[in-house]
Amino acid sequence: MIKKITALTLLVSTALSAETLPDSHMMRDMSMGESRRALQDSTREVNQLIEQRRYQQLKQQRLLAEPEPAARALPQSAQCLPIAGVYLQGVTLLSPADLSALSALPEQCISSNDINRLTRELTRLYVQKGYITARVQIVRPNSQGELGLSVTEGFIEKIEGGDRWVNSRLLFPGLEGKPLKLTELDQGLDQANRLQSNTTKLDILPGRQVGGSVIRLRNQHAKPWLITAGTDNYGQKSTGQWLARATATLDSPFGLSDFVSLNANSTLENPAHRYNRAYTLLYSLPYGAFTFSGFASFSSYENHQQLPHNVVKLHGQTQQYGLRSDYVFYRDRDQIDSLSGQLTYKRIDNYFESVRLEVSSPTLTLAELSASHLQILPNGVFSANLSVEQGLPWLGADRHPSSVHLDSQFTKGKLFANLSQRLKLADATYQLNNLFYGQYSRDPLPGVEWLSLTDRSAVRGFSRSTQTGDNGWYLQNTLSRSVNIGTATLTPRLGADVGRILPRQDSSGWRSSAGLSSGATLRYRQALVDLEVSRGWILSNHATPEDPVQVLARFSYIF
């Protein structure tokens, strides 16, 4: 009964005295903005940790050599050999389509040169597919007068040199006794070297059996833990701009070449009256071409709004839990293609004083499928990720659309693309980075799933204005150059960003924003200092107050 009276009093007070209570849209936008930033920041942290140091073999143009094995050739001669043809034996790893690419032999006169050419082409086919230990030998003609080409395709006899930091059973599962394929070894090295404490290489040595090879792992191991502490003014004015951050990582805590990370941050200003705190935990485990990950994040905020006659409190918290699996289904010397699946649970609770704001407090369960591509270019790297998210009525998620909650069973598509390339300008080397992100949904999305165009991870330069919407895109462009100053590295940069959003909650149509930025990063041993000056403009609404010039600073140290 008391709760009913309190709620009724609140509603009546809102209707009778708009001057004493904040606007409902303002409360919704503020609470939703805090929740959205918390969830999207933790998602970015998880993705960065998962992608960090992956694909080192490809980016470094691999640590393994690709020597073309020397085939046993006949003496060079154009004279006809006393043979009626050529037959192959021992070929199991090449398809008929592969073999059809071989040059045809003459029907009447087959010379040593023809046999040598065929042997080289056959060997090259194996090498191109990654079977670098395949050997082609010439055997005497059979009863039909056909010369034989016998292929020893090569297999992994044994893998040795593993330890608790490089767990060969999980990095190279099931490879012993199977054909030696270079891309599978590269994949295992990628998994080993994704741990910052590992610098793993391998040697391919002759085995005891015919065609067998021994894989010997060599690892230079550093300390398995890292702690990074820092501070920056990337926070919000409502909850505090200056934040303290700390990240702790531990490599192979269970001897499985696994990885665990804990990230925490909190605002520093007046924590008794306003704060924003967030924690993210990630664990990942490799298994050959698979990487399995689990993550959890929690955040809370509180701020007090000064009204003409009193002070009111807005506060809330977010929870996010997820399971993810990544699978590399194709790779060669220049590219990697992978698939991933993820299940995420999100719960958001926002309050005005003690009243839960239902409109900005959804509970969601999302399934996401994505495909990724990484391509090494002559002067850079290109990566892209295309994904689809589907809301599900599982784990207590909101089930039905209503006037309070938008449909939690939405479908959303996302596209991320990044091009990083080296440029030569006036005899100096520059780095140009172009990053594109876009999302689209035919369904009205919950506010925590909107794209925030004025977030510093999108269009840089905004500290006051907010532009959010269901659908939209942005493009970040950054030109930088690294200069060595003694043992320090200074990297100045210039940035220009643009983006558009289409909110479904009103009929104003597309909205556009742009931003310019300049900054510099100084790295000296384990210390980092970053300064940035930026400014953003709302291009589609001239009634919006202009944002001032924004100055951001970040300091961090790795222990």
Regions found by a protein language model. Name each.
Residues 349-498, 502-504, 544, 553-555:
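C-terminal outer-membrane beta-barrel translocator/porin domains of Gram-negative envelope proteins
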Residues 507-559:
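C-terminal beta-signal and terminal closure region of outer-membrane beta-barrel proteins
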Residues 227-229, 258-262, 292-294, 323, ...:
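Transmembrane beta-strands of outer-membrane beta-barrel proteins
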Residues 1-19:
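Gram-negative bacterial Sec-dependent N-terminal signal peptides
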Residues 166, 186-378, 547-558:
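Gram-negative/organellar outer-membrane beta-barrel architecture
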Residues 20-235, 265-277, 435-436:
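Periplasmic polypeptide-binding modules associated with outer-membrane biogenesis and secretion
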Residues 231-235, 252, 264-270, 296-302, ...:
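Transmembrane beta-strands of outer-membrane beta-barrel pores
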Residues 142, 208, 285-289, 375-377, ...:
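A generic beta-sheet turn/junction motif
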